[in-house]
Amino acid sequence: MSAKIRNTFSAAMFAVTATTSAALAPAGYAQTVSDTVSFVNFENREVGVYGNAEAKEDFKRNDYDKSWWYAMDKNNGENSKVVYDGEEHGNVLQLKYPKGCVGPNDNDTPACAGQIIQPLVKTADTMWSAYDIFFEDGFEFQLGGKLPGLCGGKCYTGNAMPETGDGWSARIMWRKDGNAVQLIYFMGQESVYGDDFKWDLNGTIPQKQFTTGTWHRIVNKVSMNTIASPGNGDKNGRVQTWFDGELALDVDTLRLRDYDTVKVDKFYLSTFHGGSSAEWAPTHDCFIRYDNFTVSTDSIAVKAGAPDTTAPGTDRIGAQRQDRLNATPAKAYRIDGSRVGGKKANYEVKVGR
């Protein structure tokens, strides 16, 4: 079986490597298809324009939530393409951030990149997401910009503050010089534009930064807060983020909802420079590449091909964390069961446990 066919089959099966045991999983232990809500790695696509039609096929949505929309045909299809990235990553999504673009809309400036709101086929109180990201050489970070993340309910963004506990969002941002933060909209936030949470583990590690010319891996875990009574949510919602295999954010005092009907129910591929004013805009065309968009109800390996480092009871900073991060990577397998190396294989599944 050719690598291209294997990878296409893998994408169709929504497969990712992950583990669920509190102990390190044995080699070959893989996340089952039922755990994975969505998986898109673009190996099923030919090189060329990636528009709304392709996005609708790949980013599967549920049949009852009509809030989904796709905006991947910006600037006559020039913003969104599948490109070949080499043997390790294969086909990936390349988004263009044109000179002068600010915000998600067209208005009087070129439209930035692309947008997808994906109502998930499964909802949960706890959900994981992950993707790989590559800022191409010459990318201008300027004052900052938005990156994909999870949200739920009304998915508050922009200058709409959640005041009735009916929605939240936890997108990612790059800030000046590529500094990485989580932009969270929640009950009690200080800013009308959401609150920044730095990826520095509450000041205990150096601030994480996106750099150009390097593939980074982002893994997010969002857990809904409990409800004391309808309309009265507890302040124990939790957002955790791993950056290139290291825990960079762990905040567990969030009031994300006031009703237990509000879940993690959408993946929001929202990306653009801004802000809204001209000083946020790039002075030349810039590009970001994306791969392996994953949403799962079960844990996701924070390093490609590595055992899970975030099993229940061990995902906070503690004595076990560094030992687990330094553990020998799990073996990766092709669909036919043979041992392989390389990134795409790390996301293929050996079906069953």
Predicted regions and their residues:
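Serine/threonine-rich, low-complexity intrinsically disordered segments
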Residues: N7, T19-A22, A311-P312, R316
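C-terminal outer-membrane/trafficking sorting elements
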Residues: A311-R353
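Generic low-complexity segments that are intrinsically disordered, proline-rich and/or Lys/Arg-biased
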Residues: A11, A27, T32, N105, ...
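Intrinsic disorder/low-complexity segments enriched in polar/small residues
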Residues: I5, T32, L183, R321-D323, ...
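C-terminal segment of classical bacterial N-terminal signal peptides
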Residues: V16-G28
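Low-complexity, Ser/Thr/Pro/Gly-rich disordered linker/stalk regions
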Residues: Y29-D308
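Bacterial N-terminal signal peptides that target proteins for export
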Residues: S2-V16
